[in-house]
Amino acid sequence: MEKLFVLVFALALLAFSSDASPILTEKQAKQLLRSRRQDRPNKPGFPDEPMREYMHHLLALEHRAEEQFLEHWLNPHCKPHCDRNIVHPV
């Protein structure tokens, strides 16, 4: 039991005294956050621009909805309901 305690104490002391500690100083954390974005090019479409990605997603959804709407209204098999000359689309 005493050997286990000494071993755990030695490991804890080693972890806190060496640079193996996972806790970063504020300066190191800011430097890491600053440098992380520079290792890949900042071109449109990259996840660095989440708003642009979201807008592309919304445009794709809108395009798909428009295609489905036109597919429904131009379907020749539902004539009286889908004929734009007879019925105004709601």
Swiss-Prot record:
Gene: Gm525
Intracellular or extracellular location(s): Secreted
Protein keywords: Secreted, Signal
Native species: Mus musculus
Main location: secreted
Keyword Cell wall biogenesis/degradation applies: no
Gene Ontology CC annotations of this record: extracellular region
Claim: Translocase is one of the keywords in the record: no
Coiled-coil positions: none
Annotated protein name in UniProt: Uncharacterized protein C17orf67 homolog
Signal peptide annotation: 1-20
